[in-house]
């Protein structure tokens, strides 16, 4: 749960960083109405007409099952997705290229870095990589 003070700080920093470059008026997040991850991903898929989607880390399919892509691969060694491997194991034999890759796997710095580097090898030109939990404690 984010405190009111934290919300204020985030809104303040967001406006300092982005308002000057992108927006003409002050932007405030409506914290209770933020879109879900799958809504953001589906909007990107729809707007850019992406067809091939890869998700690294699909815990219980909370996100993966709601993705509307023609072709989707979900990699998780424990639960969710449609490939039961670690991301390292998957990328060793990967032959696919993806329009959109969502990284939400093991949340350790070294593994996140590996997942980003591996994803870049299999990202189509003009593709997008999204990260969740990109500030691990390690």
Regions found by a protein language model. Give the residues of each.
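A short alpha-helical cap/connector motif
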Residues: 1-102, 106-138
